[in-house]
Amino acid sequence: GFARSSDKVGVVITSTGPGAANVVGSLVEARFAGTPLLHITGQTATENLDKNQGTVHDVPNQLEMMKSVSKNAYRISSSKNVLEVLEKALEEAMTPPTGPVSIEVPIDVQRTIINRQETFNKVVINDKNIALGDLNTLDLIEEEIRKSKRKILWIGNGGKKLTSEVEKFIDLGFAVITSTQGRGVIDENHEMCLGSFNAIPKVEKFYSSLDLMIVVGSRLRGHETKDMSLKLPDNLIQIDIDPNAENRTYPSKIFHLGDGKKVLENLYERLDDIKNIDENWIHEVKSLKKEIQKDYKEFLKNY
């Protein structure tokens, strides 16, 4: 919760064995949600590591267990490399796509008394954010936006902090829809925001009439696309910080690897001369929003 609300790294400390096992579910959730998290846990003494001797705190394959649910997992083998491992783990947790990184510290290393090094006060975590990305691809995206009249942004978890940028794209004539994780990027009372009603029949029919859909920071995961059977526009552009997102669930006409904030800012600067928005298009989006809200309220009456 701290990491998600503060944009800082969360830190959790557990005991070894059952303590480490109990945090597995939370690490899975943090990884899925892209939450930057540093998990520190214990381990048996160095001389007993990986021998499966049943010594106190001995948990076979604990490091592998942590690796399976984290972005990565490290073991501090000596008090001499504490700072090095911490820096590496923090950097990895903060590098997009962000997520949890685990560190296990053998009990004898924990008990080692060391002098605090001056370098501990000057730790700088490198910002590895992917910047704007390929300018040639941005040229192609600009061209597609200029050609389109009926266009929509699909905002996922990776774009949920882009309130200002999304509002500017509404000024360019974009409607907005979100995944569940992307909710709150703008006020859902906004007339051009369809909320997270992204897979209902009326909205799917609406998709078929669109010239363009731009997906920002969303997996388009099965839960929100009817296991990838939801029909999305053929002219689909995907913007994501994760290179593995390309064609993972849906084929995209254009995939752009870059920081969503910087990409949308750059595109808006190119496109802010677009002023003549079709009033009929705006009216259609507003009418659809009223319909789906009415349908949902009727549905809730059953409960």
Briefly describe each language-model feature range:
Residues R4-T14, A20-T41, K67-F120, E144, ...:
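Structural signature of the thiamine diphosphate
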Residues Q43-S68, E188-M192, P251:
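Active-site-proximal loop->helix
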Residues G133-E144, N302-Y303:
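A short, well-structured juxtamembrane/interface segment
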